[in-house]
């Protein structure tokens, strides 16, 4: 189910966010947390994404597991600022292959010492365009209504 359809519902929406572990050794703690959260019957669960795609495979695996085992729709986060184009395409294709149709597209924090002028993606809007070209995704984004803090 697409998140936009859930949010359009007149009833209040309940969602939870989980963070993938940094290593596969900590998967059990995430699995146990997901079990407890899923029992609360949330409308959806979001799964965050490590900076630079460091836990991107974990994001896709956890999101797919939540949907497959618990029937809870998921929203996979993606960041782009320090991710090469090929990584973004691979992650997007993996999400699609695993049946994840909801993505929260974020620029992400600029890593210390990173030269933004060398980035394949400088803005989340560029990531959104890339995701749209790769499948029928429901894409959300974040914004700063008054201006991004970097420009204030």
What are these regions (language model features)?
Residues 53-77, 120-141:
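Alpha-helix-loop-beta-strand connector modules within alpha/beta enzyme cores
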Residues 1-47:
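Conserved N-terminal beta1-alpha1 strand-loop-helix module at the mouth
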Residues 102-152:
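Conserved anion-binding
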Residues 9-13, 41-44, 70-74, 99-101, ...:
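Short, well-ordered coil/turn segments that N-cap beta-strands
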Residues 21-24, 42-62, 109-119:
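Glycine-rich, proline-tolerant flexible connector loops at the mouths of alpha/beta enzymes
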Residues 26-34, 59-60, 91-92, 149-152:
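Distinct, well-ordered alpha-helical segments
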Residues 13-29, 74-86, 138-152:
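Active-site mouth loops of central-metabolism enzymes
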Residues 80-94, 121-122:
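Glycine-rich anion/phosphate-binding loops
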């Amino acid at each position: 189910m697409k998140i936009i359809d859930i949010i359009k519902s007149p009833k209040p929406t309940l969602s939870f966010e989980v963070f993938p572990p940094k290593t596969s050794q900590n998967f059990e703690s995430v699995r146990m947390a997901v079990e407890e959260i899923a029992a609360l019957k949330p409308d959806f669960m979001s799964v965050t994404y490590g900076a630079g795609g460091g836990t991107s495979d974990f994001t896709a695996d956890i999101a797919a597991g939540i949907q497959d085992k618990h029937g809870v729709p998921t929203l996979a986060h993606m960041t782009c600022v320090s991710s090469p184009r090929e990584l973004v395409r691979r992650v997007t294709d993996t999400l699609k292959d695993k049946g994840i149709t909801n993505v929260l597209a974020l620029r992400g924090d600029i890593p210390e010492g990173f030269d933004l002028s060398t980035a394949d993606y400088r803005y989340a809007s560029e990531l959104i365009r890339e995701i749209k070209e790769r499948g029928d995704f429901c894409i959300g984004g974040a914004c700063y209504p008054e201006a991004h803090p970097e420009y204030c």
